[in-house]
Amino acid sequence: MSKKHLKPLETCFEDEEDDVIYLPPGLVTGATSKKNEEFCGGSGKVQPSEMKRRSEGTSTDMTSKRAKKVSAEDEKKVGEWTKNPYFQRLWSEEDEIVMLQGIIKFEDVTGKSPFEDRHGFIEFVKNSISFEASVQQYIGKISQLKRKYTRKRKNGFSEGHEQKCFKLAMSIWGTKETSKKTDLCSSPKGKKVKEEDGDVTNSDWFENSFLLPSIESLGVDSVKRKWNVVPMEFKKKIEERLELLEADESECKKMEEMLKVKNSECVKQKTNLLNEVIDVMT
């Protein structure tokens, strides 16, 4: 009799015709005891004519035990997966509201733009966020919220949470960028020029970055023309990576300033130590 191999748990649930059945522990034990009693003839002695059946029964018993063991382990794993799903939402809905409200309040309280003073903004809102996020995570989340709620400006959102986020996003990015789009996407005759969402809202970030000066030897006008025909998806990827790079550079500058201060303190301590030694010896 050929040995049948057990399939993974999820495969067995999907394949209704599979021969392997995951039996409850009690049923497996009962079935095994009955098998043993039957081919022992009820007396505990093995009959010669039953040797073949004993071999088959042993194989069945082994398979049942393996099925029981795999079932118990798989049930444990399923329970763990249920309690700890593989994909967990990092930013809660409350975090998104706090983030958008924080952008508005930060500018009102400090008079600074949270997009220019990123570290100040993070310090401003971090105690209200449900977890400890990195600078890159803050920047990525703000970019994601901006893309999500400015792209669907025309249709808006019907659900409660998303509708609230949409209104907050419009108060941050809507008015300013809508006026830009009206000016830049209209022809002299008043006819609107078709342009993909988001292309105009950040039309100058490429020119203000280090990218354009680095390749201006190819001709500024030529570079701008070629950049205008680059696919929007690629532009957005470059913009996101540039934001992360700028955040890292800002962190490096802070660390450099801290090192300068520390170095200055070390020089001062050396001077004081030298003066003390000189005073003792003179």
Swiss-Prot record:
InterPro entries: GEBP (IPR007592), GeBP-like_C (IPR053933), GeBP-like_DBD (IPR053932)
Keywords (A to Z) from UniProt: Transcription, Transcription regulation
GO annotation, biological process: regulation of DNA-templated transcription
Domain of life: Eukaryota
Residue segments, region Disordered: 33-73
Pfam families, alphabetized: GeBP-like_C (PF22757), GeBP-like_DBD (PF04504)
Record family assignment: Belongs to the GeBP family.
Protein name, entry field: Probable transcription factor At1g66420
Species in which this protein is naturally found: Arabidopsis thaliana (Mouse-ear cress)
